[in-house]
Amino acid sequence: MNKPLRNSHPLFKIANNALVDLPAPINISSWWNFGSLLGLCLIIQILTGLFLAMHYTADINLAFYSVNHICRDVNYGWLLRTLHANGASFFFICIYLHVGRGMYYGSYMFTPTWLIGVIILFLVMGTAFMGYVLPWGQMSFWGATVITNLLSAIPYLGMDLVQWLWGGFAVDNATLTRFFTFHFILPFIVLAMTMIHLLFLHQTGSNNPIGLNSNIDKIPFHPYFTFKDIVGFIVMIFILISLVLISPNLLGDPDNFIPANPLVTPAHIQPEWYFLFAYAILRSIPNKLGGVIALVLSIAILMILPFYNLSKFRGIQFYPINQVMFWSMLVTVILLTWIGARPVEEPYVLIGQILTVVYFLYYLVNPLITKWWDNLLN
């Protein structure tokens, strides 16, 4: 009997095993939709970015005005730009929910998948930071100056590294050109890393909400989860389009409507909202190098999860105290986001420092509490 083309064609077979005949746990909830939503976000960002790049000019004298030109003169340029800017926000909403799901349900026990996921998160954060610099508004310029300056905290190599990154003695034309170059290439590297992320995931199969082996009860990915994913796509696109058409500048910074001026510093230099929690952690350490280390660790600490797991059950569904701790940690991150947007003055400094300690303590104490709970029930 002839096999369907999707089972015999060498290229279609790969797609088929990943998207059609893939055995998926029957009980995965909507929390498992965010992987496909991130794929959709990445495609939206690459497509809108590609068309924006056709009209953008990476030159400090022209960048701000080329963005203005895109919004005023290019057909649907305003739509492309607002979709791209707000698409980044949705990308981060989905990525944080995706990571939170992985932490809650113990998906980090797929060690290679998890570690590649954290690397993807770093790459996406780097891409978003460089994209924020491109319109060359006040916050673009000063954000680039402040964040790249952090490299100078590295002992011995610091200043050389910063000047090498800038391509001169200050953030200038060379910096903008290279940031545009990297901003263009990185999403394609993220795309390649996503393929590897999926490759490792499909070696083990998906986790599920009860954290047990689901090999005895699996269903094909298509049509069940393809349609479930499409429902997620519709919901997300609806919210994104609503934001873009009703209040496109809601999540942006008003300072970025002012062309970059190296002689005037904005009153409050702050990144986009999705970096504020990390920015608050950076600011809460009085020492420059210590702040940089804390900033990197705020994300890199996710990498310890697979190696510091002491529980008998996968995830924290069956650990009530850990559930309370998890949601408290989420509140901590939200409060850090609020602190990141506040000026550096009391009581905000102290609150930020307390929240930073609480944030890092979660990762260290959480496995110990699961161990204690297991011993209690023995």
UniProtKB/Swiss-Prot annotation:
A single GO BP: mitochondrial electron transport, ubiquinol to cytochrome c
Main location: mitochondrion
Signal sequence, start to end: none
MF terms in GO: metal ion binding; ubiquinol-cytochrome-c reductase activity
Recorded GO CC terms: mitochondrial inner membrane; respiratory chain complex III
Residues that coordinate or bind a ubiquinone: H202
Cofactor note: Binds 2 heme b groups non-covalently.
UniProt entry tagged with the keyword Manganese: no
Transmembrane segments: 34-54, 78-99, 114-134, 179-199, 227-247, 289-309, 321-341, 348-368
Cofactor(s) the protein requires to work: heme b
Binding site for heme b b562: H84, H183
Residues the entry annotates as binding heme b b566: H98, H197
Effect noted on mutating M103I: In strain: BG1
Membrane-related topology note: Multi-pass membrane protein
Function: Component of the ubiquinol-cytochrome c reductase complex (complex III or cytochrome b-c1 complex) that is part of the mitochondrial respiratory chain. The b-c1 complex mediates electron transfer from ubiquinol to cytochrome c. Contributes to the generation of a proton gradient across the mitochondrial membrane that is then used for ATP synthesis.
Note: Heme 1 (or BL or b562) is low-potential and absorbs at about 562 nm, and heme 2 (or BH or b566) is high-potential and absorbs at about 566 nm.
Family named by the database record: Belongs to the cytochrome b family.
Name this protein carries in UniProt: Cytochrome b
Record gene name: mt:Cyt-b
